[in-house]
Structures are given as structure tokens and as C-alpha cells.
Amino acid sequence: ILEEVFGPILGKLLGIAYAWFFITLAALNLQDLCDFAKITVMTETPRLVLALLCVLVAVYAVRHGLKVVTQYGTLFTFVEFAIVLVTIILLSNQMDFQNFLPLFAQPVKNYLHGTHLILTVPFGELVVFLMCAPCVRLSSKDATKYWFGGAAMGMVVLLSVQLRDISILGDTISMFTLPGLVVLRLVNLGQTLSRMEILFAAALMMLLYFKISVLCYASTIT
């Protein structure tokens, strides 16, 4: 498509740029996954072993097509949503809404900078799904609905997590590398829900692996 629209030379250059973007983004997410696993659940496992295992499984999934890559994505997405909702309910008695005050105390440029980062990093990466569009049999109306619906769901979850963490940790949130895990460790209902952060960590690592697989798939068809 790029070559048909922009010509053979410029189209190839844009294709290379897209492939480089997807590969670089996959590498950054792979680093995040390995760092997260080392900090939380696999502290004794060498980082190289974690990276190799993730890459091999991602390549295996990509080799068998987009359907294999996305089959488990929905399951772990809803698991993550459920964990966020349950923790908000269980930790509601520990939330202090005074932690949100004072409102709008920062300069306007700080809010603009933060908004730019959010729109660029998490939501700017949605461009990768354009590479998967030819594999999805949907009308343009349905595709638009699912596209913006998925983005809206992601925005709601990210906002809910941030509001939950700030309301509980307050100013101390800047002291923690993984404030979400710190908050989840506060959930303690006897021995039934005393280690919910392990479930959260496992689901988050699977979602990162899903993201890496999609990026690898996009880079191979670019």
C-alpha cells in the first residue's frame, strides 16, 4: 500500500521506518517485561533467559498467524480489568480523597506535557493495529466502533489505576518504582486474597507478551 500511494522509493523508506518503529517498540516492551519479572516473581532467573523464552514463544505464535496471537489476549485483558475493579472495591476504605488536593496547582505547561506523553506513548502505539486491519473481516463502521471502543476501555482502566494509586499512596507514590504492586499488597482478606499482586503480575506479563507478539507480527508484514 505504501508503495502504491507514495511510489516505490518513498514507499520502501516509509516501510522500513514503520518496521524499525515496531521492532524498537517490541524491544522496549521486552525490556519492561524482563525488568518487571525480575523485580516481582522471577528474581533469581537471569534476564537473558527471560528474554529468550519470551522471544521464542512470540516467534512461535507469530509463525502460526494472527489468530493464535490474539486468542489469549482477550482472556488476560478481562482478567486485568477484573483485578483493577476488585482492588478498587476492596481498598475503598483505605482511599483518602484529600490526596487529590490541591487541584490544578501545577503550571499549565506541566499538564500539556503530561497529556502529550499519554497521547504519544500508550495511545500513539495503536497505529500498530492498522497493520492487522487487512486480516480482520469487519466493515469500516464496525472497525471504527471497535477501535475507539478499545481505546476508551484502555483509557478508563489507566485512569482508574492512577486514581486508585494516588488516593491510597498520596505523595509517596513517587517513591515507588511499581506503585500498583505496592497498592495490591495492601489487599488482605485472610489467606484467600493475601497475595493478589502475584495474579496481577502474571496477567500483566502475559499482556506484555501479547503486545510484543503483535509488534513482532506487524514488523514481519510491513
Show which residues each predicted segment covers.
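Membrane-interface interhelical connector segments
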Residues: 168-197
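Membrane helical hairpin/interfacial module
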Residues: 1-47, 53-56
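C-terminal hydrophobic structural anchor segments
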Residues: 213-222
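Membrane-interface helix termini and inter-helical loops of multi-pass transporters
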Residues: 32-42, 95-109
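Small-residue-rich segments of transmembrane alpha-helices in multi-pass membrane proteins
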Residues: 8-17, 76-91, 151-160
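Membrane-interface loop-to-helix entry segments
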Residues: 33, 48, 61-91
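Hydrophobic, membrane-embedded alpha-helices of multi-pass small-molecule transporters
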Residues: 18-22, 26, 50-55, 63, ...
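Membrane-interface helix-boundary motifs at transmembrane edges
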Residues: 2-6, 66-72, 135-147, 222
